[in-house]
Amino acid sequence: MTTSLISRTGRVQSWLDNPESRLPVSCTVFVVEDSMEGPNGIEASWRFASHALRNGAGCAIHLSKLRPKGTETRKGDDVLVASGPVSFGRIYSVLNEVLRRGGTYRNGAIVLHYDLNLPDALEFIQTPRSELPWVKRCINITD
């Protein structure tokens, strides 16, 4: 006798019946590295979020590895200044808005995560909802 390791209810059954529709998962986490490029970089997280949202899944985007706002780094002769996690939060918000309004409504969501013990936590918390209307925010608290 064989048993199915997948519970055939809700989203999973819907996907098994029609694998062209929504993904059978509700939410996955993408930990963003402090780099624009690379498989776990900022740009890769945009592709990840876009794919999840277009297929009806949600995603959690963990922004705690990004450099704090105002941090200076050198690239050759140039001095680059980090814009911080909230600035990237605006991009995820717009991405979600555009994908939800463009064509068929999908039931995906984006939750931005940020660690409480980091320098930009207060800005992350206090940014008005009107500036990040299409994402939810979560502060990670540790002992």
Regions found by a protein language model. Give the residues of each.
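Extended catalytic cores of very large enzyme megasubunits
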Residues: 1-143
